[in-house]
């Protein structure tokens, strides 16, 4: 990626005028036959949801971990194949105009557990996998930055983009309104309890026969809210209820895949990688029973072993505690073991994702079955 620094005063709070001028200049300097362009300018510090509320119908991405920078996105400037070489090729043909200390551009992606799994409702809108660069990306930590990506050939509609910038800036400066009181919800469709019981018994039988070591069963449930609460309202409630979890969302048309997860599949910073096994659950007040349970311990260890096995080809060292700890969430307790490693050579994070996803914590052993 070709980076171009731009003079941006970082003393004090960023101003609309200075950031708008930088954006306007970068757009004006881009020719009709120019490469892809990403412009990153300082922005007001606000919750990542503030960008999404500026244009709710254009929301595309939210990534909001509890202890590091959050990102949100509007629109899709570029869809990429979920592969390391596709990402590298795109950024090699991209100019990045940014101020000092600005974050690097970021793409966002996701993948189903198995090829073809997205052929059925409710996953049809999302496909088996995706990788995208939002048109507008808001990065927020101690500082905040707003990025615009222009990837279409030909001259861009600069006046329209600047109008959108003004609307976004106004949303970032306004506090998010008070969320209404909790509303009731009712289930209108869920798996038959008898069929569910039969499925669980079948799983237990196959484990006894040695076909599987671990299986995570799942149920489909449709819930209807009594009010017209939207996806952004649900995400705000998740933030309030599960502050230690990562909020994430992907919008596609009228559909939204969203949640708040305590799990970390993989994090890579330089040559250091971090994963964790989060398997084994119980209610509050029952931690001692969970930690003493041979069943919970054995199933947890299957997840630890799978993560170690997946990372071993890439790492020259791996370490994890001998004993798991208890991870406390507002509604449940989990057994947790962090796994740290050091890469023997530079490795793209997508290769690590491919080696681990899905872990037995959310799937089973053996995974391919």
Predicted regions located by residue number:
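Non-catalytic accessory segments adjacent to catalytic cores
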Residues: 2, 6, 88-220, 314-316
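An N-terminal JmjN-like helical accessory module and its immediate linker preceding a catalytic domain
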Residues: 1-81
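Conserved hydrophobic core element of enzyme catalytic domains
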Residues: 339-369
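An anion-binding catalytic pocket shared by soluble metabolic enzymes
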Residues: 65-68, 74-78, 219-302, 313-318
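Short glycine/threonine-rich loop-to-helix capping motif typified by GTGT followed
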Residues: 225-230, 329-333, 365
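Cytosolic ligand/metal-binding cores
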Residues: 1-34, 142-172, 260, 264-338
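Generic, well-ordered alpha-helical scaffold segments in large soluble proteins
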Residues: 202, 206, 237-241, 306-314, ...
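A short, Trp-centered hydrophobic/proline-enriched beta-strand micro-motif
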Residues: 33-40, 57-64, 106-108, 213-215, ...
């Amino acid at each position: 990626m070709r980076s171009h620094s731009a003079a941006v005063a970082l003393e004090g709070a960023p101003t609309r005028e200075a950031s708008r001028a930088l954006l306007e200049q970068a757009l004006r300097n881009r020719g009709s036959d120019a490469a892809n362009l990403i412009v990153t300018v300082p922005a007001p510090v606000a919750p990542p949801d503030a960008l999404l509320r500026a244009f709710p119908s254009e929301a595309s991405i939210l990534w909001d971990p509890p202890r590091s920078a959050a990102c949100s996105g509007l629109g899709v400037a570029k869809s990429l194949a979920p592969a390391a070489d596709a990402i590298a090729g795109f950024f090699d043909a991209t100019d990045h105009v940014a101020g000092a200390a600005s974050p690097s551009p970021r793409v966002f992606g996701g993948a189903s557990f198995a090829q073809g799994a997205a052929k059925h409702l409710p996953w049809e809108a999302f496909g088996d996998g995706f990788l995208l660069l939002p048109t507008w990306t808001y990065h927020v930590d101690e500082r905040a930055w707003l990025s615009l990506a222009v990837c279409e050939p030909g001259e861009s509609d600069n006046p329209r983009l600047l109008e959108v910038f003004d609307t976004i800036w106004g949303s970032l400066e306004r506090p998010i309104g008070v969320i209404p009181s909790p509303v009731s919800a009712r289930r209108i469709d869920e798996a038959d309890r008898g069929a569910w019981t039969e499925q669980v018994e079948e799983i237990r039988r196959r484990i006894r026969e040695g076909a599987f070591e671990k299986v995570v069963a799942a149920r489909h449930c449709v819930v209807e809210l009594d009010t017209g609460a939207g996806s952004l309202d649900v995400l705000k409630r998740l933030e309030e209820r599960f502050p230690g979890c990562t909020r994430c969302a992907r919008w596609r048309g009228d559909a939204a895949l969203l949640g708040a997860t305590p799990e970390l599949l993989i994090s890579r910073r330089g040559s250091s990688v971090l994963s964790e096994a989060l398997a084994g659950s119980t209610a509050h007040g029952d931690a001692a029973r969970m930690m003493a349970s041979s069943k919970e311990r054995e199933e947890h260890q299957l997840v630890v072993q799978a993560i170690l096995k997946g990372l071993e080809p890439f790492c020259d060292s791996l370490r994890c505690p001998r004993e798991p700890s208890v991870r406390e969430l507002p509604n449940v307790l989990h057994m947790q073991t962090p796994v740290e490693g050091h890469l023997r050579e530079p490795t793209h994070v997508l290769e690590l994702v491919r080696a681990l996803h899905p872990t037995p914590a959310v799937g089973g052993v053996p995974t391919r079955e």
